[in-house]
Amino acid sequence: MAARAAGSGGWEVVKRSRRPGASSGGRGGGGDRRALGEANGVWKYDLSSPIQPTSTLYERGFEKIMKRQNKEQVPPPAAESKKPVNKKQPKKVTAVASQNQKQGPFRSLEDALKALDVAALQKELDKSQSVFTGNPSVWLKDLASYLNYKLQTPRMEPTLSQYPHDYPYSLVSRELRGIIRGLLTKAAGSVELFFDHCLFTMLQELDKTPGESLHGYRICIQAILQDKPKIVTSNLDKFLELLRSHQSRPAKCLTIMWALGQAGFTNLTEGLKVWLGIMLPVLGIKSLSPFAIAYLDRLLLMYPNLTKGFGMIGPKDFFPLLDFAYMPNNSLSPSLQEQLCQLFPRLKVLAFGAKPESSLHTYFPSFLSRATPSCPAAMKKELLASLTQCLTVDPLSTSVWRQLYPKHLSQSSLLLEHLLTSWEQIPKKARKCLQETIQSFTLTNQELLKKGSGSNEHVVTCDTACKGLLQQARGPRPPWARLLLLLLVFAVGFLCHDLRSHSSFQASLTGRLLQSSGLLPVAQQVCAKLYSYSLQSYNWLQETLPACGSYLLAVVQPSLQLAWTYIYATFSFLSAYCASYLAFFSDSLAGVLQRVQLPEALHQLFHSLKELLLLFYHSVLLPMWHLLLAALAQVQEHCHEACRGEMTWDCIKTQFSTAAHWTWLCLQDVTVAFLDWALTMISQQ
């Protein structure tokens, strides 16, 4: 029977030829019970060493308890003692009478664990080990069945998302943990098959209505994977096929994902293996995606130090995650996309590994191919930042870019423009390599423009960006014009100071330097020529400027007078009506404040503000306006009186000289006053 059961993937019903009721499936006089082996549901894979279908001591004590779970018909114990079906099976013993009473479910798992008699569990396990000395798989199945039967609560959702990651094992007492771990150590060779037994029993219970709660099996699974997570990670293909076979049953899929995910909470490497091998392939399925992303979030938060996960995520896994996180209208909801985007920086750290300076060039082609002008703004920002990181960290990325440049002009134009705007943030060590790459791009652009390819627009954009980058790489040009002007002013100032200090050119330092160097005759010739040219220019201005000025004044004066009249009228109008509008605004504000019934402090604040504005208007704005008008009128009258209505060179020269002399005197007075004040303050100190 065991051989047939192992070959068919399930357990057969035990039949008695002398009891017709048993062969027809009717109820026999011996009562119903559930055999332990029925938890082994149909599995796509053949187990290498199937569990022998041996009855357990614990189940014999519950023949009357499990009548509602009618899976097999078995004759009563008295009939079996007379004519057993299999002589190899040991003689059955009756269970303790106190355990034959069915208990109802507890309100919570905490209450169920408090009510659990650990001594009774140990007693049952000792009996099982004494009866089935050579079959440790039966011991383990007795443990799981006992715990699951005693820990009955209202059924929870499959992923236990409202509880900590180690629930329900975190509620187990130290004594019970010792019993579970001790039994797992004794039956170490059957632990992997025991994990399969717990998983498939959970899946079978989900088919029942109402089924049992699964806390006992969950506790056993967590206890197994705390010490042996490789039971899951060494068989990922097998479990992925199991998951896909139940894809139409979300509750079963989530139960499988929860059970396999327990392997990741003791080791980051094993957790990433589970997520990449089990949960990433189903990412995008509406019912499974929330748990997959929540598991990844919890996994990355549990391990702040990601060094143990380096090398687990490669380009093959990284870029599908990038598309899921940033591409719109994919199978993830916006909230899940946002959650995945928040995890993406940590995923980048895991993907780039411990030595990004030697691995980033492998990511560069996929980053560049996705950076199209039509990609979403958030994705474009992430791609450009990642491409810049590749170019600045891994020197081999520039050589990869050179190979891809002619076939990725639109993407390269975006990257070049981004580099142009962020050139100052690029490290100086990477600028030299980038400068050489951009120079090669300039030559490529010229060749493409000569050929006149269909993507001329992108070539022109790339060429413009390359020229701008090269200009920035070479640095800003020196301001030669400003430097020459500054040098000229300094030379003139030094010469004037030298002549004034020595009262003559021959005694000055400049004169003596020119005379000793033999350049004095040349300097005299240059000065003579400059003087003659200056005199000619002066004579020309003396003859031309009065005539031009008079003509210009005759032409422009009517228009200027008309414009002045309009400007004066406009400002007078604004000045006249400004007070009325301010008064209207003040009255309106006062009425509003009275209707609104603001606090007294706000009334006082607004009243003070109104008084301040009126004071500023009457004390500052109006006097300044009148002073400006008076000053302009005085300037006009002074010019008219000084020139007597005619623009002559002597008049212009006199006015400029007077203004310059007055300005110079004012500057001297201010400078002397400042120096006196400074000396006074220094002497007081």
From Swiss-Prot:
Region (Disordered): 1-36, 66-104
Superkingdom of this protein's organism: Eukaryota
Predominant location: endoplasmic reticulum
This protein's UniProt keywords: Acetylation, Apoptosis, Endoplasmic reticulum, Glycoprotein, Membrane, Transmembrane, Transmembrane helix
UniProt-annotated glycosylation sites, renumbered to this chain: 267, 305
Record-annotated disulphide pairs: none
InterPro entries documented for this protein: TMEM214 (IPR019308)
Family: Belongs to the TMEM214 family.
The protein, known as: Transmembrane protein 214
Source organism per UniProt: Rattus norvegicus (Rat)
